[in-house]
UniProtKB/Swiss-Prot annotation:
Name recorded for this polypeptide: ATP synthase subunit alpha
Described purpose of this protein according to its UniProt entry: Produces ATP from ADP in the presence of a proton gradient across the membrane. The alpha chain is a regulatory subunit.
Origin superkingdom: Bacteria
Localization, UniProt: Cell membrane
Source organism of the structure: Leifsonia xyli subsp. xyli (strain CTCB07)
Reaction(s) catalysed (UniProt annotation): ATP + H2O + 4 H(+)(in) = ADP + phosphate + 5 H(+)(out)
Site (Required for activity): S374
Lineage of producing organism: Bacteria, Bacillati, Actinomycetota, Actinomycetes, Micrococcales
Amino acid sequence: MADISISPDEIRDALKDFVSKYEPAKAATAEVGHVLDASDGIAHVEGLPGVMANELIRFADGTLGLAQNLDENEIGVVVLGEFEGIVEGMEVTRTGEVLSVPVGDGYLGRVVDPLGNPIDGLGEIATEGRRELELQAPGVMHRKSVHEPLQTGIKAIDAMIPVGRGQRQLIIGDRQTGKTAIAIDTIINQKANWESGDVTKQVRCIYVAVGQKGSTIAAVKGALEDAGAMEYTTIVAAPASDPAGFKYLAPYTGSAIGQHWMYGGKHVLIIFDDLSKQAEAYRAVSLLLRRPPGREAYPGDVFYLHSRLLERCAKLSDELGAGSMTGLPIIETKANDVSAYIPTNVISITDGQIFLQSDLFNANQRPAVDVGISVSRVGGDAQVKSIKKVSGTLKLELAQYRSLEAFAMFASDLDAASRRQLARGARLTELLKQPQYSPYPVEEQVVSIWAGINGKLDEVAVEDVLRFESELLDHLRRNTGILTTLRDTNVLDDETVEKLSSEVDAFKLEFQTGEGKPLAAVGREDFDAIAEEDVNQERIVKAKR
């Protein structure tokens, strides 16, 4: 057996060579965990003792996850993508990053998923940076009061429930009552502002679709393209087929994209369609993470889910660029019950609500806005002066018409004041009807409402009111500068009122009724203008007695 000799010099040289090649800067450590189980879009992972809340972690197959539950021995992770490839024992590593999304003007005209990846087949998106999804809302001292109008183009809303830039205005109602239609009309109505090229007027729009059918999202995109509104709109889509985690995150993605523009001094409109489905997705995620359920099985922090989202909508101070983000969250009710858990939560967070009634919708009153319980708490300060002047009594007259209409059902005959108010109310109600995808400029809304509340439609048959309005507006567009004056000044002064009154009277002489007769030749009960003291239900009831 040969002798083994060890040379000290060789050992010394080998150690020197190893030490000379060692580079401490290239050495790294990594926390590695392992999957315990994965199902229904949720994975439980052991290990990773230093992981942060809401940190992104990466599975061995490249799939990302969001750390939610930080328990003593395991982590509850929401899988962001397909979880079929995630199996027990798979390695999981930390990324050290929180969830963020790319942002920039490249997102205009595009359809993306909740991670900001394009899904419209139009190639990659040029980005300007990244923004965290869970970003803090602006503080109290960083805000400014809402004072600029955001026109929806819908007469019933702009006149009685006005929305200002930076406001959160809830749209609430049963399914199939026109909630999405109001939101889409509002986006379409921003086209004139966009084409003006004035950054102070332009409004960038974001439509967040949560839990909608894929065909519905495609229809919305098609409607926006047909109206030429897609060029200033981004769609964030989390359809019904997506995992619950994506539906939960989609509104935050849209908000992060919008905040980038808001902090850049621009104006943004964001629509969350709808937050009921986001709450249901968050409930599913929470139950799968084994969090304790509360009322209606929702987790205890479901209020915070929506409050931290909607508080990001704001009008920023001049020091921060005076940008704004206006939020139109949508909530779906069951059987018109606005006192349920999620509806009352969101009503308490927002600055007002537009309530849509299924009974009005089925009676062909569209948009089916119930002006009795709809309210805008801050939008009045942002309302244009001209429409504020003509709409001052509109809401009161309509409310009194509704109550008098119910009273008249049980009366055998009515006095003249009651008949006048019923006739006026029926025409005002008809005047507020509006076809979908047909928003009105504010100056045309002013003319229509002025004609209604000043008795110019009292001799027009109810079935002819919308045709009378359409032909009157065509006449004013062609023959006078009244609409131009209203658009440029936003003021309805005495001189403009006098011109408008004479033009409407002249048009009435030319108008043909549905029966082909001149309006002036149609015999109708002669109603004098309603005296202010007669517009009072108590007085009418006493007169009846």
